[in-house]
């Protein structure tokens, strides 16, 4: 079962590891498969009972079809929110449940509920990022959350031991990780691997090697004795399903390199800095900035601004590529925009729906966003325009994403089957955004006065 899941997850894991090496803040995903195997190894016994191979196949088929279909439909209906949650990663969880049911029986799959709950919570990075942001967003905070996840895995992996020993192993894992987390968090990936991977594994091994005074449960038997006989055809079907998932490429990875621009592009574009938002450091790290620049006014056109998120790590910027930083009455999604002479490659459009506004005091908006590199910084530039044609309402300011409100609210919105609407945007609004984007892009592409600009 573990081999089947690893093959299905191999392509995604390769991209996750590459992102972690590049500086991604979701580096804990590198050790998550190890923690999952550690927990699964703790299920060495299963309860007595009569198995039914045909029922196992039926249940596995229903879970697989319904689970994968639900993931596919949610990704199609709300692509941006699904991409932020990396909802496609849950496909491996669904497949793992199906494999366990077919290979070991439905009864054993039910006893592994704690493993499924663990993976459902941490296979997607949003809960981890939200917890890290709540603590402050520093590398130490991220390492603390990762070490806590590893400690939870230790507790779940020692289920057959006495509660006192389980708690002791969990405490030892946390205590052993603490000095490393506090002193070595600047080496983020190695710290995560050791604190959330190596130390939990050693803690479980140590707990199991210690003599156990707990008596065996007479209602349980070794899993090898309870494992039903499966034919070569069964293994072949599972292998085919695994190959299909592996070929599907669960991880969406954009390898396009951002264009390089002069570091003084804001000054040369006539943009004036008017505000900065410190909350971004909780999500993108202490070296990141989010700055709003005022755009030159144009008579008869809506108000506009330029927001620039800067960070030294391209991987961190990729972690947040699907975050919506502006308020909206309904779920909104990024859409690709065809590159042209005035629109940078990779530009995406995002806007609120004025027809679906739930708060009359709110300001609807239209935004074009793209990624670029200025010197040693990677930047996400967003040209945001107010949909108020009078020009007296500034576009809304960026807000910290609320994972619970945005996600639960979006799922509730979807359950109510609200119509998507026509997504009408006044031509003046889109024209204002396109014109400002073209002006900024043209200045960025031109050489600096006195010589060509540096390209790192």
Question: Where are the language model's segments positioned?
Answer:
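Loop-to-helix transition at the N-terminal end of transmembrane alpha-helices
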Residues: 19-37
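Membrane-interface helix caps and helix-loop-helix hairpins in membrane proteins
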Residues: 17-22, 73-85, 102-108, 128-138, ...
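Alpha-helical transmembrane segments of multi-pass membrane proteins
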Residues: 1-17, 245-250
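Membrane-embedded alpha-helical segments of integral membrane proteins
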Residues: 134-217
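Short, hydrophobic transmembrane alpha-helix segments
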Residues: 12-25, 43-50
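A cross-kingdom signal targeting lumenal/periplasmic-facing segments of multi-pass membrane
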Residues: 298-455
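Internal/C-terminal transmembrane anchor helices
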Residues: 219-253
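Alpha-helical transmembrane segments
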Residues: 1-11, 58-69
């Amino acid at each position: 079962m573990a081999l089947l899941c690893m093959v299905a997850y191999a392509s995604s894991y390769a991209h996750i590891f590459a992102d972690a090496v590049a500086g991604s803040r979701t580096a804990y995903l590198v050790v998550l498969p190890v923690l999952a195997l550690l927990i699964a190894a703790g299920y060495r016994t299963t309860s007595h009972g009569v198995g039914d191979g045909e029922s196992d196949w039926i249940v596995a088929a229903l879970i697989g079809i319904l689970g994968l279909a639900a993931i596919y439909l949610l990704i199609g209906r709300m692509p941006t929110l699904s991409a932020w949650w990396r909802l496609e990663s849950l496909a491996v969880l669904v497949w793992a449940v199906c494999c366990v049911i077919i290979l070991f029986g439905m009864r054993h799959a039910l006893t592994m509920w704690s493993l499924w709950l663990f993976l459902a919570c941490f296979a997607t990075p949003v809960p981890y990022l939200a917890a890290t942001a709540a603590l402050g967003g520093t590398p130490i905070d991220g390492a603390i959350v990762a070490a806590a996840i590893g400690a939870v895995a230790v507790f779940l992996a020692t289920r057959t031991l006495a509660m006192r020993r389980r708690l002791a192993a969990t405490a030892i894992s946390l205590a052993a990780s603490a000095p490393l987390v506090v002193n070595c968090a600047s080496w983020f990936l190695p710290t995560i691997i050791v604190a959330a991977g190596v130390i939990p594994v050693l803690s479980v091994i140590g707990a199991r090697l210690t003599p156990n005074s707990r008596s065996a449960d007479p209602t349980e038997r070794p899993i090898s004795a309870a494992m039903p006989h499966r034919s070569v055809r069964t293994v072949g079907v599972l292998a085919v399903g695994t190959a299909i998932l592996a070929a599907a490429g669960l991880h969406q990875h954009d390898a396009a390199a951002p264009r390089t621009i002069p570091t003084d592009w804001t000054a040369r574009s006539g943009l004036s800095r008017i505000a900065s938002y410190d909350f971004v450091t909780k999500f993108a790290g202490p070296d990141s900035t989010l700055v709003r620049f005022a755009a030159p006014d144009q008579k008869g056109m809506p108000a506009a601004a330029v927001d620039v998120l800067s960070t030294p790590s391209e991987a961190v910027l990729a972690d947040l590529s699907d975050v919506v930083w502006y308020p909206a009455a309904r779920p909104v999604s990024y859409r690709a925009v065809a590159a042209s002479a005035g629109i940078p490659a990779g530009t995406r459009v995002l806007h609120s729906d004025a027809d679906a506004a739930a708060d009359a005091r709110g300001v609807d908006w239209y935004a074009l966003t793209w990624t670029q590199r200025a010197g040693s910084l990677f930047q996400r530039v967003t040209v945001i325009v107010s949909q108020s044609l009078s020009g007296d309402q500034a576009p809304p300011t960026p807000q910290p994403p609320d994972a619970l409100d945005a996600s639960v609210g979006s799922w509730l919105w979807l359950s109510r089957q609200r119509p998507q609407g026509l997504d009408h945007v006044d031509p003046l609004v889109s024209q204002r955004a396109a014109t400002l984007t073209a002006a900024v892009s043209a200045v960025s592409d031109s050489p600096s006065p006195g010589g060509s600009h540096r390209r790192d």
